[in-house]
From Swiss-Prot:
Residues 1-21 form the signal peptide. Its main location: membrane. Residues 22-268 are annotated as: Non-LT domain. The gene is mltF. It is a peripheral membrane protein. It is found in: Cell outer membrane. Gene3D superfamilies: 1.10.530.10, Periplasmic binding protein-like II. This is Membrane-bound lytic murein transglycosylase F. InterPro entries: Lysozyme-like_dom_sf (IPR023346), MltF (IPR023703), Solute-binding_3/MltF_N (IPR001638), Transglyc_AS (IPR000189), Transglycosylase_SLT_dom_1 (IPR008258). GO terms for biological process: cell wall macromolecule catabolic process; cell wall organization; peptidoglycan catabolic process. It comes from Serratia proteamaculans (strain 568). SUPFAM superfamilies: Lysozyme-like (SSF53955), Periplasmic binding protein-like II (SSF53850). Keywords: Cell outer membrane, Cell wall biogenesis/degradation, Lyase, Membrane, Signal. The lineage of its organism: Bacteria, Pseudomonadati, Pseudomonadota, Gammaproteobacteria, Enterobacterales. Residues 269-486 are annotated as: LT domain. It is an enzyme of class 4 (lyase).
Length: 486
């Protein structure tokens, strides 16, 4: 899969040009009438969104998601409260806009010309391609002419418009079903489960779901990269639109947009079927032996992250030993183990307790200037290569005019720690920075797989329990709506 990157220079230039074009009509700074003044008088910015692993979901810690965080920041920027209206169906989003129940749609929607008669778009904040998906083990189609079976897409999605264009221009015999009951994510899951032959999805959602459904396979790209944008009601004044342009320009300039992309999309890289399949198998067969220990000693972090670290270190093998002498589930060196009070590195409980304590000590060293949700990545890189080399990575980032408190900036410098043109200038010298980079990225992917896979098992178990309970009641089973949140 293509690495997802935002063209921040292009976004900045386009935003500036649009702002200049709109400048004579901008009323929001003076607060004189218009849609923005209505929002400020109301004290609320109302957004309609979709429940999904990327856009908006809820956890024990509260709401989360890329679009939620962007919208929350926009509401704060405007000085109002954010009100979120979640939906399952895309058509409901645009109904909210038409009925003035929402001020904007923040739902990870692809730019689509068919929607422009009802709404206008905001700036792009990342891009995706539309892809045809099939189940691994079945025949891979090379074009739509090779499709033999049922193709379904979500009603109201950009995929419907894409298929209509293809039918008109290239494939007159192309047919599909537009489902109003199932979301794009649910259709992808049906393909993974063998209940549907094909569907279209966006490259980000597909990449996320492959972490828990490795049998999902991409046949081919249906479109080139397309922008993902917010939508506003067409026909209103430009005050809210102009404020949005200014907000996005600021987000690009201060690096916030890059940080959010890193948080939600940074782990979406190349997909390894064998590695993912092996990991998911280990979740069922090996993890139950150690789960209670991970839960017991993961005090400052999610136990699933601690488990992901251990898998990256040893593949959950308590007897693991490397040629350099590191040993055990958490692969501790003798010196580190002595400093942590670990007597037997091959004892699973001692190893997990020691590794968790070592990680806590590293997290305590991370400067307070580093954002709370990024501190763990600095700590993990240091866990792999040592705290001194992490200081060097921050130093090099600052030397190159980057932000030493931003993980997206610092991680780009990690591979440079092994390059002769850089490491002689640094305090702690040569380091295997590329290994540290891959180490953190792998752990992030394992964590995503673990969280998603366990939630999927819980969802299926709840569904089966509901169906069994309803079998004797004389009415159809109702599938509970349990969102898959990464």
């Amino acid at each position: 899969m293509k690495r997802l990157k935002i063209n921040y220079i292009l976004i900045g230039v386009v935003t500036l040009l649009l702002a200049l074009a709109l400048w004579p009509n901008i009323t929001w700074r003076g607060g004189q009438g218009g849609q923005l003044e209505e929002i400020k008088s109301r004290g609320e910015l109302r957004i309609s969104t979709l429940n999904s692993p990327l856009t908006y979901f809820t956890t024990k810690q509260g709401p989360s998601g890329l679009d939620y965080e962007l919208a929350k920041r926009f509401a704060n920027y405007l000085g109002v409260k954010l009100v979120v209206i979640p939906h399952k169906n895309i058509n409901d989003l645009f109904d909210d806009l038409d009925d003035d129940d929402a001020d904007l749609l923040a739902a990870g929607l692809i730019y689509n010309q068919d929607r422009l008669s009802r709404a206008r778009t905001g700036p792009a904040y990342y891009s995706v391609s539309q892809q045809l998906v099939y189940r691994l083990g079945t025949a891979r189609p090379k074009t739509f002419a090779d499709i033999k079976g049922k193709l379904a897409v979500a009603s109201g999605s950009a995929h419907v418009s894409t298929l209509k264009q293809l039918k008109q221009s290239k494939f007159p015999d192309l047919s599909w079903e537009a489902s109003s009951d199932l979301t794009s994510k649910e259709l992808l899951e049906q393909v993974a489960d063998g209940k549907l032959d094909y569907t279209l999805g966006d490259s980000v959602t597909i990449a996320l779901l492959q972490r828990i459904h490795p049998q999902l396979a991409v046949a081919f790209d249906v479109t080139d990269e397309e922008p993902v944008t917010w939508y506003l009601k067409r026909g209103t004044d430009d005050s809210l639109y102009a404020a949005m342009l200014d907000f996005y320009s600021q987000m690009v300039d201060d690096g916030t947009l890059a940080r959010l992309e890193e948080k939600y999309l940074g782990h979406v890289g190349s997909f390894d079927y064998v590695d993912t399949k092996t990991f998911l198998s280990a979740i069922d067969s090996v993890l139950p032996t150690f789960r209670s220990l991970f839960e017991k000693y993961a005090s400052e972090i999610d136990w699933k992250l601690l488990a992901a670290i251990a898998y990256q270190e040893s593949h959950w093998n308590p007897q693991a030993t490397s040629p350099t002498g590191v040993r055990g589930l958490m692969m501790l060196t003798r010196a580190t183990a002595d400093g942590l009070g670990v007597n037997d590195r091959l004892d699973p409980e001692e190893s997990i307790q020691g590794g968790a304590l070592y990680l806590q000590r590293l997290m305590a060293k991370v400067p307070d200037s580093v954002p709370e949700d990024e501190r763990i990545w600095f700590s993990l890189a240091a866990y792999n290569m040592g705290w001194g080399h992490m200081l060097d990575a921050r130093k090099l980032t600052k030397m190159q005019k980057g932000n030493p408190d931003s993980w997206v900036d610092v991680k780009q410098r990690l591979p440079m720690l092994s390059q002769k043109r850089y490491y002689p200038q640094l305090t702690y010298g040569y380091a295997r920075g590329r290994e540290a980079y891959n180490y953190v990225e792998n752990i992030r992917r394992y964590q995503v797989s673990l969280v998603g896979y366990l939630q999927e098992k819980e969802r299926k178990a709840a569904q089966e329990a509901a169906e069994q309970a309803d079998q004797g009641k004389g009415y159809p089973a109702v599938t509970p709506e349990l969102a898959l949140n990464f």
